């Protein structure tokens, strides 16, 4: 998935509108992922509470969106920009890269729900392509 200049500017503009709510987006998206795709819970079995809105879910949701924020700043070279995160997920945490797509979908759902006015069809396409590109960049070290 190649991001066009239009995609990049659309994502940056959308991020400018939604970034103040990034922690809430992350917490909701991660909570949804764990509830809707229970197989993803295996990575978080050390948490005392995996329910939506719990402390660990909120904390990790914040971390996830910190990664998305980083990706927005590295949008012109995601593979290099997200190299350390890819390394961490591939070798230290051994996360199956298919889970990045699942979480990307949950992020899209939450952005659509929280920002219906901003989530235009153009924003939807560009954010979807961006998150797919982020997932691909995170999977880079698995090869």
UniProtKB/Swiss-Prot annotation:
Keywords: Heme, Iron, Metal-binding, Oxygen transport, Transport. GO terms for cellular component: blood microparticle; haptoglobin-hemoglobin complex; hemoglobin complex. It comes from the Eukaryota. O2 binds at residue 60. Residues 2-143 form the Globin domain. The keyword Iron applies. GO terms for molecular function: haptoglobin binding; heme binding; iron ion binding; organic acid binding; oxygen binding; oxygen carrier activity; peroxidase activity. This is Hemoglobin subunit alpha. PANTHER family: HEMOGLOBIN FAMILY MEMBER, HEMOGLOBIN SUBUNIT ZETA. The keyword Nucleotide-binding does not apply. Heme b binds at residue 89. InterPro entries: Globin, Globin-like_sf, Globin/Proto, Hemoglobin_a-typ, Hemoglobin_oxygen_transport, Hemoglobin_pi. The gene is hba. CDD domains: Hb-alpha-like (cd08927). Belongs to the globin family. PROSITE patterns: GLOBIN. GO terms for biological process: hydrogen peroxide catabolic process. It comes from Thunnus thynnus. It holds the Pfam family Globin. Heterotetramer of two alpha chains and two beta chains. Red blood cells. Involved in oxygen transport from gills to the various peripheral tissues. Coiled coil: none annotated.
């Amino acid at each position: 998935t190649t991001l066009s200049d239009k995609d990049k500017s659309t994502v940056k503009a959308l991020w400018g509108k939604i970034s103040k709510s990034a922690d809430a987006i992350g917490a909701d998206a991660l909570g949804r992922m764990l509830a809707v795709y229970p197989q993803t819970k295996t990575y978080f079995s050390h948490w005392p509470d995996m329910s939506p809105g719990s402390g660990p879910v909120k904390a990790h949701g914040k971390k996830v969106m910190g990664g998305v924020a980083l990706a927005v700043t590295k949008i012109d070279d995601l593979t290099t920009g997200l190299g350390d995160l890819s390394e961490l997920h591939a070798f230290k945490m051994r996360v199956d890269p298919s889970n990045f797509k699942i979480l990307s979908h949950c992020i899209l759902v939450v952005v659509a729900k929280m920002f219906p006015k901003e989530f235009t069809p153009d924003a939807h396409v560009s954010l979807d392509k961006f998150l797919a590109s982020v997932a691909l960049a995170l999977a880079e070290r698995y090869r």
